[in-house]
Amino acid sequence: MKRNRFAASIAAAVLLVTVNPFAQGEPASGQGRAIITVLTKHNEVSPVVRPQDVSAKVDGKEAEITGWAPFKAPNDKLELVLMIDSGARNLGRQFEEIRSFVQNLNPGTKIAIGYMENGRTVMAGPLSADHNRAASELHLPAGPRTNPYFSLSDLAQNWPSHDSDARREVVLLSDGVDPENRRFDPEDPYLQAAITDSVRAGLVVYTLYWRSAPGGGNSLVADGGQSLLSELGQATGGYNYWEGTGNPVSFQPYFSDLMRRFDNQYGLAFAAKLNRKPTIEGLKLKVEGLVQVTAPQQVYVHLPGAE
């Protein structure tokens, strides 16, 4: 991993242009990084956030900010996987909006479409900046319903790239329900495993609620699925999109918000005390100014070179 020291004398304008967002400073006993989304409250152009405006606590203890910079050219690499639930066979009417979203991503964004099958994420093609090609790989899922959290864990453990400088983000289209266990459990072990795997892999997971059951299904089951999806999004620094427990008329407002989030993200690198083996810890981030900040609730802390 590249290691740069943020010198206090460097002008903010130079910092914003030249620093790799995930660059690390001098390590303490442990280090980590995260993707942070910074928006204004009324959709204005987001302000520049300087390193001195940011503070963090990891595991309840003050952490040293060793890197903070926006994802702007030339350091704006984004790898995005659109995951589609194997039960979403009623999704056909939304395909035009999904294709448009894929085709209108920023030119440098690499995207792939994955389908949940038998506890795995089956990729329709490689991560590619050819958005028209990726859009052409969109089709209705064919396999039986599977646990979405199994599939997410598989994706996190087998991310289709080794570019450590790129953002890794996921748009997960699902109702969040395990077909083998439809009872809501806030400590669902498969969800917790998916969160751990995603945090360790540095994934930001956005969830788009899409109800696969015809006729609406059971509202208690739907509420439970949404709660699990919400927990997943909050833990990884993503966002959760839904309209009640029914399917949205249009995905367009969601896709517009996603585009805005992709364009307003920062790379955070930090040093924190690590008294044992690499671990998942809680993150509390504070950013000065009138901004809305979305940060992961959990981060992976590890020894230098032990990612």
Q: Which residues does each predicted region cover?
A:
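Positively charged n-region of N-terminal signal peptides that target proteins for export
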Residues: 1-5
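Scaffold/interface architecture of coatomer-like assemblies
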Residues: 23-307
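Bacterial N-terminal signal peptides
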Residues: 8-18
